[in-house]
Each structure stands twice: as C-alpha cells, then as structure tokens.
Amino acid sequence: IVMNFDAEKVKNDIVEWIKDWFNENGKGCKGVLGISGGKDSSVVAALLVEALGKENVVGVLMPNGEQFDIDVSKDLVEFLGIKSVTINIKDAFNGFMNEFKSNNVELSTQAITKDTIAAAISISIITSLNWSKNL
C-alpha cells in the first residue's frame, strides 16, 4: 500500500519534466503522439497539453481498416482541442502480410504477432510525422 501518495504533485512533476525536456531537446517543437483512445494515450495527451499547450500537441489516429471504437479517439482529440491526423495503416499492414505470404513465411497465429507489425508501422508513422514541416 502506497501511503501519502500525492497524485497532484506527481502530475505536476511530470508536466515540469515534459516542459524541461522540450526546452532542452526540442524547443519550439510539437508533441506528436498516437491516440488510441485508451488510458495510456489519453493520459499522455492530457499531460502534453498541460505542459506544451494544445496548439503544440498533435494526435495521430491510426486505424487498421475499420476501427469500431475510433470515435473514442476522435472524442479525446476534440475534448483536448488538439490537431489530429488520421492515417489508416490497413494497406501498409496488408502489404507486410502479403509479402510474408508470398515468401512462404508462416507467422505465429498469436494475435501478438499482428499487433507487433501494426505497432512497428505506427512507430514509423509517428516518427515521420515528428519531422513534418506543416504540423
């Protein structure tokens, strides 16, 4: 059991750390992050908005084809008032899967294999957008 946990202090410390990091490493840059609508990306997005201002945060929505819960991500972006970009990763994902198949590569049937491929695509997208000239 954690005693005397001060959530407000922890949040403020994180916000200050984000400000310091951007001042030292990316002054004038925007925070670009993937928005899934889940707890993790929602909390990080809110912390970035508090630290950098909503005009300096860009949310990236990356559905893999049709995503039944994409509205949760859109609602978060709207609530925070941040700019967003939606990049559908379906074609890239299917391209990888087709290349594996055409080369007779049998992937594990575990969902984690497909999740790993989708995550790698997402990281590439966010990294590329991080260098964008017009976001």
Which residues are covered by each model-predicted region?
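ATP-dependent adenylation/nucleotidyltransferase module used to activate substrates
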Residues: 1-135
